[in-house]
Amino acid sequence: MKTEIITSDVLIIGGGTSGCYAALTIAEQNPELKVVIAEKANIIRSGCLAAGVNALNAYITEGRKPEDYVDYATKDANGIVRKDLLLSMSQGLNRVTAKLEELGLVILKDENGKYVTRGNRNIKINGENIKPILAEAVKAQKNVKVINHVNITDYITEQDKVTGAYGFDVNEKIAYIFSAKAVLCATGGAAGLYRPNNPGFSRHKMWYSPFNTGAGFAMGILAGAEMTTFEMRFIALRCKDTIAPTGTIAQGVGAKQINSLGEVYETKYGITTEERVYGTVAENQEGRGPCYLHTEGIKEEQGKDLLKAYLNMAPSQTLKWIESGKEPNEQDVEIEGTEPYIVGGHTASGYWIDDARRTTLKGLYAAGDVAGGCPQKYVTGALVEGEIAAETILKDLKQEEEGQQSEGQASKEQLEKLAQAVDQEYESCFAEKKSFFGTEQIEEAMQKVMDAYAGGIGTNYRYNEKQLNIAEEKIDQLFALTKDLTAKDTDDLLHIYEVKERLVVCKSVIAHLKARKETRWRGFGQNMDYPGTKDDWDKKAVNSVYENGKIKILFRDLTQTPDFGQKGGTL
């Protein structure tokens, strides 16, 4: 393969929500620094915002304060959060919202010029073009270089510091070596670990981006970064088949969750995110399904508004209504839970970070869905974390410069030597060797294992330790098969690394599920060996570090705030 070495001050891996905003922040505060964004897709329509959104779900509305949002997120996660992270995120929500509007995002306003709210924490937007707005702002920065269609596979470490990363072009046989003084991981969460709602050709009709494979998680795990709360999986309550969001209906028109008998069941089980999922699963198990959002009988105008609202983010739901011949006010909307995802924007799973968004690896920072401890980020929270991480990078680089500390970057000779090794690693996948399985077969087998033995849809999100032991054994067997996978082109090479990434994340998920010996979130998974909650787990984070080929479990006190500073990795 052809190899290219690119040097910068800051490398941002992932050009999604937080990655873009981090680049903007650095460009505005220090336009002399050279920033490179390595993006797997194309920055214009990449990441979770690719299809657009119709609301900003994290905003401090009139009469509320940031501490209220912290309380809400803490209760929703049943206490397993880092309040320091939640507070610093909440304090920036309205600031980044104002910046988005300044960049061109249309935020709906009432006759008095105030934002139109949707519930206590949301505001309505016309957000089909939210990602292009961010991307164009980034592309306008002279000191920011965006390299699209590059899949990053590993970090580069020198002198116990992350000094870059390497990857390959997904369209051409080019290997990239990125050297940087600071690296921000903003690669998003992990989808595709479990068997999805829809089979075959429609398997990517899912809640979370199917192209978010957990790459940032996997790189961090293998590099020895401390991870947190992978057992807190996210399961979304969605419109059946289309997997379209339900919040637009529930909050937009006040639709209640009802069973097949027409009974409102949400008050019976609770109204936190996971309780809404649990109630739906329980009603179906007890023979009172299907379950619905009760929209039949709403005003005709409200029905028309719903048809329009879904065009901004999930047009398939609008098409389903149209094809049925009935509008939203003429029929209820059937709902279901999705397969589990690992996503730090909704749960507390991800890198273990300090309040400045430093990871336990020196020189490496994390923001957005890849960062743990701070659930309920949504779009604006991811923006804030990108901003915080960027400002920390600026501060740390300035301290290094003033203290004349060693930057820890590899020399030209070291980079050239690394380039040869990377080329050999990738080229080995193109070698002719006998492989009985392809990436798609291994991925399907992985999803079947996770569904059956690690609490997927097929078991109503239930699992026990015996099942998890089986899952661990089978995932190890599947990972061993990946060494024989071969590629005809870079697209095949991409799929090889994606399935490897998912398998690494699966191993961590299984280890975390085994470690939390209670059922903290019934809707996100029930440990049938430990079906209740335990008081001694109320302030305990389940963390892990990959050492000598094994996942080592650590327990951290959530009330203690870590500070990794310039040293990295110390509590």
Regions found by a protein language model. Give the residues of each.
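An anion/pyrophosphate-binding glycine-rich loop and adjacent beta-alpha core
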Residues: 219, 225-335, 340, 383, ...
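Short, well-ordered coil/turn residues at beta-beta hairpins
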Residues: 14, 180-182, 186-187, 367-368, ...
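Glycine- and aromatic-enriched mobile tails/lids
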Residues: 1, 5-8, 22-25, 29, ...
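N-terminal Rossmann-like FAD-binding beta1-loop-alpha1 element of flavoenzymes
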Residues: 10-37
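Glycine-rich loop(s) and the adjacent beta-strand/alpha-helix scaffold that form part
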Residues: 185-244, 379-392
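FAD-site-proximal beta/loop scaffold in flavoenzymes
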Residues: 154-171, 177, 329-371
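Conserved N-terminal glycine-rich FAD pyrophosphate-binding loop of Rossmann-like flavoproteins
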Residues: 41-71, 247-249
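Conserved redox-cofactor binding core of oxidoreductases
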Residues: 45, 96-182, 186, 190-197, ...
